Swiss-Prot record:
SUPFAM superfamilies for this protein: Eukaryotic type KH-domain (KH-domain type I)
Gene: HEK2
Protein name (record): Heterogeneous nuclear rnp K-like protein 2
Domain KH: 32-96, 143-208, 236-301
Biological process according to GO: 3'-UTR-mediated mRNA stabilization; chromatin organization; intracellular mRNA localization; mRNA transport; regulation of translation; telomere maintenance via telomerase
Pfam families for the chain: KH_1
InterPro entries: KH_dom (IPR004087), KH_dom_type_1 (IPR004088), KH_dom_type_1_sf (IPR036612)
Annotated region described as Disordered, given as residue ranges: 1-24
Quaternary context: Binds RNA.
Keyword Transport appears in the UniProt entry: yes
Matches recorded under SMART domains: KH
Species classification: Eukaryota, Fungi, Dikarya, Ascomycota, Saccharomycotina
Keywords, sorted A to Z: Chromatin regulator, Chromosome, Cytoplasm, mRNA transport, Nucleus, Repeat, RNA-binding, Telomere, Translation regulation, Transport
């Protein structure tokens, strides 16, 4: 499918934190909708902007109530919630996409977003767009993804009978849409991922909002998701690292001493598969009580692997 930029663009939002936005006119008669997005910590920081300038510009430009949940300890996700008229909410989310797809011209020292998040719901379901998917290959970087949080009953309305409604959204707005198969933790919420140009995503949001109002499922009694850590002892964060079998011994160390020290330093549990997989790799499974510890253990294992590879090359 070729993605095209919408011929009827949403009003331009703030492209940078420094831009001042004129207050938008609010239609008091228009029905209000509230939509929620799942964000990574890095995405949340970009949308907030320095001193909250970016989100404030989006708020003023579109006349919406918009905010991001507080950062919870041991959580790698935050929620964005926006309330306003259908058009205002859709256009503000188009502005969010523009912020997330803008070049990091002011973030020279920022680390790139990791390809895989330990909190699996942050990992995009859809693959990144390729240049041949855009009508203008030079604009492919403007294509973004949103993780819209929807309840199970809302999913049914959005998909429609035999997928008729979601197919129409895809065809009409030259966008890609997919619904997660699993619920967000401790909730009846799922992710509706939308990929496309900002204006195309805005038009999708408008149609989705109209559908939710028409089917009377905009406000449901289903259990909603909120980032939470519970008590430390109840948290179980897991990640796996595949290591070529020939390097496993070196990473374990004499008598398992090296891996034991790594466990102690990172405060994680690390187990190693007894048998290699079809790629002749053995999986290291890391389990801990928080994202940071597990990620640290993961990085240290990969660093040790790189060091061992270099050592062997030098001996050749």
């Amino acid at each position: 499918m070729t993605m095209t930029d919408s011929s009827s663009p949403a009003p331009e939002g703030p492209a940078a934190p420094a831009e001042a936005a004129a207050p938008a006119k609010v239609d008091a008669q228009a029905p209000l909708v509230t939509l929620r997005l799942l964000l990574s910590l890095k995405e949340a920081a970009r949308i907030l902007g320095r001193g909250g300038n970016t989100i404030d510009n989006i708020r003023k430009a579109n006349g919406v109530k918009i905010g991001i949940s507080t950062k919870e300890k041991s959580c790698s996700d935050r929620l964005l919630e926006v309330t306003g008229s259908i058009d205002a909410v859709a256009n503000s989310l188009a502005d969010v996409v523009k912020v997330l797809t803008a070049d990091d011209t002011n973030e020279e020292d920022a680390e790139p977003e990791p390809e895989q998040h330990i909190f699996k719901h942050l990992n995009f379901i859809l693959p990144p767009p390729s240049p041949d998917e855009a009508e203008d290959p030079m604009k492919v970087k403007q294509i973004g993804n949103l993780r819209l949080i929807v309840t199970n009953s809302q999913v049914s309305s959005i998909i429609g009978t035999a997928g008729s409604k979601i197919k129409k959204l895809i065809d009409t707005h030259s966008s890609k849409l997919v619904v997660s198969k699993t619920f967000l933790p401790d909730s009846q919420d799922r992710i509706l991922e939308i990929q496309g140009f900002p204006n195309s995503i805005a038009n999708c949001i408008k149609d989705i909002s109209q559908t939710l109002i028409k089917d009377d499922v905009l406000d449901t009694k289903e259990k909603r998701y909120y980032p939470h850590s519970k008590h430390s002892k109840d948290i179980h964060v897991t990640a796996t690292v595949a290591i070529p079998a020939e390097y496993v011994g070196a990473l374990l160390g004499h008598g398992g001493n090296r891996i034991a020290n790594l466990r102690k330093y990172t405060r994680t549990k690390i187990t190693v598969a007894q048998e290699p997989n079809q790629n002749n790799e053995r999986e290291f499974t890391i389990t801990g009580n928080d994202q940071k510890s597990v990620k640290l253990a993961q990085n240290m294992i990969m660093k040790n692997l790189g060091t061992e590879k270099e050592r062997r090359l030098e001996k050749q």
